[in-house]
């Protein structure tokens, strides 16, 4: 039975990240979303019970490191 096996999680790459990479990560979680999408710049936000836990702009140096850590500890994975 492989019905309960979930696919490996995608995480943000080192350095800056693209809109497509942010979408791929956000699509895996119930509480991770893209906000303030300005085309080339966007903010990825992690929430818990509706309150912001962490946020990072896609151009922020080192932002992906803290976002990945926060998503790992606070992300609520969508069921497949």
UniProtKB/Swiss-Prot annotation:
InterPro entries noted in UniProt: DUF905 (IPR009253), YkfF-like_sf (IPR038612)
Keywords tagged on the record: Plasmid
Pfam families: DUF905
UniProt similarity note: Belongs to the UPF0401 family.
Protein known as: UPF0401 protein YubL
Organism: Salmonella typhimurium (strain LT2 / SGSC1412 / ATCC 700720)
């Amino acid at each position: 039975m492989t019905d309960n096996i979930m696919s490996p999680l995608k995480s943000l790459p080192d350095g800056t990240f693209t809109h497509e990479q942010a979408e791929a990560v956000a699509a895996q979680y119930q509480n991770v979303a893209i906000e303030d999408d300005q085309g080339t710049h966007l903010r990825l936000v992690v929430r818990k019970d509706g309150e912001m836990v962490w946020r990072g702009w896609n151009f922020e140096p080192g932002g992906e490191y803290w976002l990945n850590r926060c998503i790992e500890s606070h992300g609520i994975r969508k069921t497949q």
